[in-house]
């Protein structure tokens, strides 16, 4: 796999879970002998939802809820077969979405 690159994008609502997962991936890649770039923090996506507090009237009384989606990018340069095998066996939390390209 010489000259190739694996790009891993991580998404999660919890920044501690995504940082721990990124740290675990980087440690695994370095241990297997490939070089790694990252984790690069990408812009956090913030969704704000406005909800009327009252079920009937009082439209001026509203409540705001937000969801933040944290994202990280990790590039693995010149991965070895050992690196790919170790990445397939790594155990990450269910709250972290992993996209491998």
Curated annotation (Swiss-Prot):
InterPro entries: Ribosomal_uS10, Ribosomal_uS10_CS, Ribosomal_uS10_dom, Ribosomal_uS10_dom_sf
Annotated protein name in UniProt: Small ribosomal subunit protein uS10
Alphabetical UniProt keywords: Ribonucleoprotein, Ribosomal protein
GO cellular component terms listed in the entry, alphabetical order: cytosol; peptidoglycan-based cell wall; plasma membrane; small ribosomal subunit
GO biological process, any: translation
Gene3D superfamilies: Ribosomal protein S10 domain (3.30.70.600)
Gene Ontology MF annotations: structural constituent of ribosome; tRNA binding
Subunit structure: Part of the 30S ribosomal subunit.
Family from the record: Belongs to the universal ribosomal protein uS10 family.
Alphabetized PANTHER family for the sequence: 30S RIBOSOMAL PROTEIN S10 FAMILY MEMBER
SUPFAM superfamilies: Ribosomal protein S10
Entry function: Involved in the binding of tRNA to the ribosomes.
GTP-binding in keyword set: no
């Amino acid at each position: 796999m010489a000259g190739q690159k694996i790009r891993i994008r991580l998404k999660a609502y919890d920044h501690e879970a995504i940082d721990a997962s990124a740290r675990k991936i980087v440690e695994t890649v370095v241990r297997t002998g490939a070089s790694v770039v990252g984790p690069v923090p990408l812009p956090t996506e913030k969704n704000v939802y406005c909800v009327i507090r009252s079920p009937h009237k009082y439209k001026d009384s509203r409540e705001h809820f937000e969801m933040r989606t944290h994202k990280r990018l990790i590039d693995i340069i010149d991965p070895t077969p050992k690196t790919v095998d170790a990445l397939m066996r790594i155990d990450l939390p269910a709250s972290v979405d992993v996209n491998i390209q």
